[in-house]
Amino acid sequence: MLEVIDKGPVGDSQKTPLLFVHGAWHGAWCWDEHFLDFFAAKGYRSVAVSLRGHGQSPAPKPMQFCSMADFVDDVASVADGLPQRPVVIGHSMGGFVVQKYLESHDAPAAVLLASVPPSGIARFLLGRFRLHPWLTARHLAITKSLGSVGRTPELARESFFSDSVPDADVARYAAGLDEEYLGGHVLGMLWLDLPKPALVNAPMLVLGAENDILFSPREVRATASAYHTEAEFIPGMAHDMMLEPGWEAVAQRIHAWLETRCPTASPR
């Protein structure tokens, strides 16, 4: 049973429901900190799922054998349980999952936040080796994980948060981070199962974080270009845009865009 956090109207709301998909190491909790309540207060049914092996969602099989298709199935299973097709909103790896989901599923719109680009994570992995060569190599060799990213508050801040996030918050968020194992889903993002933008028809908002060290402005712009739109960047933000001080600017931009793209819910 997947962990699902569900807030906002559950009846005959005229607004399209929103389905939030977290990134690697994270779970549905990262959306519950601010975004779910924000959008629920705007009248949107706001649903966040923890992908298998993340948050409180169990893994039916060892994560080393988990594929990107498994994550897409997780998103589809939650989306199929909603009364209308949801807008899908993905952060980081969750943005990659959303891109793959949209290849075979309809959605009225999609939002990508600091997303893995269609070209995958090769540059990201090279960056980890440059920044922490021995730590990255040791985790890949011994634990078969990407443990050089967020195993400590110090690494979590370096990877995900700006200096403006209080130490206590970074420690709290770091305590909620999961191990991200080198499974099929990681290989899919590296080269085996890259997105096919030509198969995607949903209108898309692509947002980047100005101070993101994981995915460069060039990669964010390439993502937007692949989906025939323009990238927008939130000033002063690090990678975890939904948890940073100033998260309201991100949420408000998404809300303004949704109000023009999805003013009412569409039937299945």
Task: Place the predicted regions along the sequence by residue.
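Active-site glycine-rich loops that stabilize anionic/oxyanionic intermediates
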Residues: 23-27, 92, 210
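The serine-hydrolase catalytic nucleophile loop
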Residues: 24-36, 218
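Conserved alpha/beta-hydrolase
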Residues: 38-60
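Active-site loop/oxyanion-hole signature of alpha/beta-hydrolase fold enzymes
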Residues: 56-86
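Flexible "cap/lid" loop of the alpha/beta hydrolase fold
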Residues: 107-143, 185-188
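Short beta-strand/loop motif that positions the catalytic acidic residue
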Residues: 200, 206-208
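Conserved alpha/beta-hydrolase "acid-adjacent" motif
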Residues: 213-219
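Catalytic active-site module of serine/aspartate enzymes centered on a nucleophile-bearing elbow/loop
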Residues: 230-268
